[in-house]
From Swiss-Prot:
NCBIfam families: PRK11784.1-2, PRK11784.1-3, tRNA_sel_U_synt. This is tRNA 2-selenouridine synthase. Pfam families: Rhodanese (PF00581). Gene3D superfamilies: Rhodanese-like domain. It catalyses: 5-methylaminomethyl-2-thiouridine(34) in tRNA + selenophosphate + (2E)-geranyl diphosphate + H2O + H(+) = 5-methylaminomethyl-2-selenouridine(34) in tRNA + (2E)-thiogeraniol + phosphate + diphosphate; 5-methylaminomethyl-2-thiouridine(34) in tRNA + (2E)-geranyl diphosphate = 5-methylaminomethyl-S-(2E)-geranyl-thiouridine(34) in tRNA + diphosphate; 5-methylaminomethyl-S-(2E)-geranyl-thiouridine(34) in tRNA + selenophosphate + H(+) = 5-methylaminomethyl-2-(Se-phospho)selenouridine(34) in tRNA + (2E)-thiogeraniol; 5-methylaminomethyl-2-(Se-phospho)selenouridine(34) in tRNA + H2O = 5-methylaminomethyl-2-selenouridine(34) in tRNA + phosphate. InterPro entries: Rhodanese-like_dom, Rhodanese-like_dom_sf, SelU. The keyword Cytoplasm does not apply. Residues 15-138 form the Rhodanese domain. Its EC number is 2.9.1.3. Belongs to the SelU family.
Length: 368
């Protein structure tokens, strides 16, 4: 029976259906970049892979293969086969891959076959699948018209996007809310993983049958996640929708996001005392990150107000003073910057309105 190979034509189906994949690359390769539906069960550990790589450079392929067999042998080999078979037992429809769909994939498949387990390996491996996803991102602006959702900080763009089937949530994929205070408790994905997850989200969106692709009007960087250049350029040329919200609602939303949610998250992760310390550091360091743009005097004023709010919060369990520095930050920093940016794209604005009005406009857009 010939070895079972999953052809490149099936990449789309693998990603859309979140097909379970056994990634037999070394842990260091997996950490740099992987797919959401993959599990790292390496043929060789990092140190073993490094030795084999050095041997390959010095003595050629056959010597490297022989060294690999000597390093992964006996009980070590048996442990790896047992880990693979356990995964396949839990995921009977699993596929496997290595970096290029070469020797590591073939050897893993052979050892599994000898253990009585048949697992297809993916043609081209991780590298070819990654290239496929890069192509998905580059082609996305051609597949559907783009609409860019803009609006002042705190107007609820993310909340709005999460209610729309036309939307892909870039900030959710980047695990960052896009502003200077947009850091979340959990770290952002690696750049490669951000791109992989973005491509899969775009693939899923393209099967949803909607008339457009709705994205938040983002900077090139979302935290430290960089939008692919071609995709970002298309976003910069897209027509714009402007979401409007009252100042009071914006203040309350930002207090909830910057203060209540972050404080609760840190305390849940670290406990009350360490949680409050980490929360305070998050706020103060976020302010430091925009010190140059604020200017020293304005930064000091905001820092003093922020510290007063933190003191009131810890001593009186009252977060009302946070509204003072948030209000100043909006009107002295975020709003002027937003209005300047909006003025440059005013000719591309299709519609401005409240959450309800925007929902109605988009509903009618779908039927045009």
């Amino acid at each position: 029976m010939p070895n079972a190979i999953v052809a490149a034509e099936q990449y789309r189906e693998i990603f859309l259906n979140q097909h379970p994949i056994m990634d037999v690359r070394a842990p260091i390769e997996f950490t740099r970049g992987a797919f959401p539906n993959s599990t790292n069960l390496p043929l060789m550990l990092d140190s073993e892979r490094e030795k084999v790589g050095t041997c390959y450079k010095q003595s050629g392929q056959q010597a490297a293969i022989a060294l690999g067999h000597s390093l992964v042998n006996g009980p070590i080999k048996q442990q790896r086969i047992e880990a693979w078979t356990s995964y396949v037992k839990a995921n009977p429809n699993a596929y496997l891959y290595c970096f290029r769909g070469g020797l590591r994939s073939q050897l893993t498949q052979q050892w599994l076959k000898e253990a009585g387990v048949e697992v297809p390996y993916i043609q081209g491996g991780y590298k070819a699948m990654r290239q496929y996803l890069i192509g998905v991102i580059e082609a996305a602006p051609i597949q559907q018209p783009l609409l860019s959702l803009s609006g002042m900080t705190g107007c609820g763009k993310t909340d709005f996007l999460l209610q729309r089937k036309e939307a892909v949530d870039l900030e959710g994929i980047a695990n960052h809310r896009g502003s200077s205070f947009g850091k979340n408790i959990d770290p952002q994905p690696t750049q490669i993983n951000f791109e992989n997850q973005l491509a899969i989200a775009l693939l899923q969106h393209q099967t949803s049958g909607v008339a457009c692709l709705l994205l938040e009007d983002e900077s090139f960087l979302i935290g430290r996640s960089a939008l692919p250049q071609t995709f970002y350029n298309a976003m910069q040329a897209a027509n714009v929708l402007v979401l409007e919200e009252s100042d009071d609602a914006r203040l309350e939303r930002l207090r909830n996001e910057y203060v209540h949610k972050m404080y609760s998250g840190f305390c849940e992760r670290l406990g009350p005392e360490a949680g409050f310390a980490a929360f305070s550091d998050y706020l103060l360091q976020s302010l430091v990150s925009i010190r140059k743009r604020l200017g020293g005097k304005q930064h000091q004023e905001l820092q003093d107000l922020m510290q007063q709010a933190l003191d009131q919060q810890i001593n009186q369990n009252d977060t009302s003073l946070h509204l003072v520095w948030i209000n100043l930050l909006l009107h002295k920093y975020y709003d002027p910057m937003y209005l300047y940016q909006l003025d440059k794209k005013s000719e591309r604005v299709l519609f401005k309105g409240s959450h309800q009005a925007m929902h109605e406009w988009l509903d009618s857009y779908q039927t045009r």
